[in-house]
Amino acid sequence: MKKDNIYRLNIATLVLFKYNKIVGGYECPKNSVPYQVSLFTGYNFCGGVLISDEWVLSAAHCKPNSNLEIRLGEHDIWEPDGTDQHIMSAEFIRHPDYDSRTQDSDIMLIKLSRPAALNSYVRPAVLPSRCARSQDGGIFVPAMRAVTRYPDTLQCLEVPLLSDDTCFNAYPFQITENMICAGYLEGGKDSCQLQGVVSWGARLCTEEQAGVHTKVCNYVSWIKNTMASG
């Protein structure tokens, strides 16, 4: 897989569930993923993607019961980096079509209580201008967890984007038009979790169990309209 064909789409890594972990990844170069954020409640509760100085994109199933700390610009979750910013959340806005049973429209916007200071360590990701296809290459997945242990540092992984047919066959009658799959069906590497926000997948990254991700390109209008009205 060529580097220049990899969509650097942060898959707002969801670590709400025990088995949502990186398999076969590596430690990201420090500060190489400036849009990655941590939803922090005394531990890395979930992940997200900074998409403007005031807004973070995450998964709807990551909505907490109260406001929490959004950590930006971090490489090590426990060690001060000198580049990190800690900002409280102000509002959580789930997509109105989110279905907790099917995980369709598993996407959410988080308004920050104050704007982030943008620099080379904290920088928004660019929303997609079109939907990715399997022939485009793969996706880049950063996360704060690994399958064999819980690392303190940000983990990275590059996995192929799978075709719709492959995705449907892996999860019969469970995939909607708002979902995409990424991973290796032969096992070995996966995020077990999103061109998109990490949504769901198998409990373990086993054979024929790719990760399922929310297709962010289907929600760009909703994202922009919500941000404009917020």
Predicted segments — roles?
Residues 18-22, 36-40, 138-230:
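Extracellular trypsin-like serine protease catalytic domains
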Residues 69, 73, 91, 115, ...:
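Alpha-helical recognition domains of nuclear gene-regulatory proteins
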Residues 36, 55-57, 84, 107-109, ...:
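Conserved hydrophobic/aromatic beta-strand scaffold that supports enzyme active sites
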Residues 81, 93-99, 115-151:
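Active-site substrate-binding loop(s) of clan PA
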Residues 1-57, 68-74, 79-80:
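Protease-domain processing segments flanking chymotrypsin-fold serine proteases, especially trypsin-like
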Residues 56-59, 63-100, 157-158, 164-166:
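Conserved H-D interstitial segment of serine endopeptidase catalytic domains
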Residues 28-32, 50, 64, 100-103, ...:
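Extracellular/periplasmic catalytic domains that process cell-envelope and extracellular macromolecules
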Residues 1-31, 116-120, 125, 132-140, ...:
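Extracellular/luminal ectodomains of metazoan preproproteins built from arrays
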